């Protein structure tokens, strides 16, 4: 396993634990006398945007930039740099996005507003999933960790495409023109072998602002910027002189230990006041929970099984189908990514849709985490791998 992947797994695993704490604290505060302070702070405005908006559109753009950097590196020299390496997690990821969406639609086909959230259970929270896997220590084979990482990266790409195609509206032609010009500038700089990161960040800031005003979700600017950062330095090497790897190294701790926990804190604080058993067992939360806990493993495992049996892909060394099934359950931990999609899906909808969708996410993610851990623990050797 490369140093880059090892560092990634270590940071993401620890970050997953911080995420759990941040979400738990938010839930406690949202159901305490501090609830008004919590909601008031998030809804207060700074420079024309609410604090919650700055977190969801601003800080999360940095998170998506990191995704762009990681995906580019993995495609060029990492876990996805050959067809043989990429095909198995890619097939699994597609199955793991289609099946949860279909399960959700089966629960909510009669409600046109609820149908807008079809993509909510299609996402996987890589930090949370790796955090749960880390509890098993070195019993987990390296190849299984890399499979989860590759699957989650492809899953993230799918989420990015979904956001771009289905959760953008009221497009501004002028702002889009500026965004396209900024994007072109970034890739011309890359082609001309410009390696000064600060120049990319300046153009990236212009891109983010124009995308924010365009009607396309602003976080997509982060992905574009991440893909534009060059992997190799002036000397053509991608090790010590890589702008991409340097920026990835700088951003990773801030994303894992600040940005994602802040996002979880700002979005997981659900007030249970007025929430009844009847509402919790409604089609919206049940559809999300079932999509995450049932749809994810159904899609990932079925797609993986068919791919192996048909000879389209081979299982990585040291992994069997029992391991794949256990990991597929862990992938039902949608948490931050699912909450992010729900915040886009129900813009303008009654507040109950946001509340119940987040309850469904928390229910499905929690069950997936517990059951996934138990299954993985039982399928792995009792001693360290």
From Swiss-Prot:
The chain crosses the membrane at residues 14-34, 49-69, 87-107, 117-137, 146-166, 171-191, 201-221, 250-270, 283-303, 324-344, 356-376. It catalyses: Na(+)(in) + 2 H(+)(out) = Na(+)(out) + 2 H(+)(in). Keywords: Antiport, Cell inner membrane, Cell membrane, Ion transport, Membrane, Sodium, Sodium transport, Transmembrane, Transmembrane helix, Transport. GO terms for cellular component: plasma membrane. InterPro entries: Na/H_antiporter_dom_sf (IPR023171), NhaA (IPR004670). One of its GO terms (biological process) is regulation of pH. It holds the Pfam family Na_H_antiport_1. HAMAP family: NhaA. NCBIfam families: NhaA, PRK09560.1, PRK09561.1. Na(+)/H(+) antiporter that extrudes sodium in exchange for external protons. This is Na(+)/H(+) antiporter NhaA. It comes from Photobacterium profundum (strain SS9). The lineage of its organism: Bacteria, Pseudomonadati, Pseudomonadota, Gammaproteobacteria, Vibrionales.
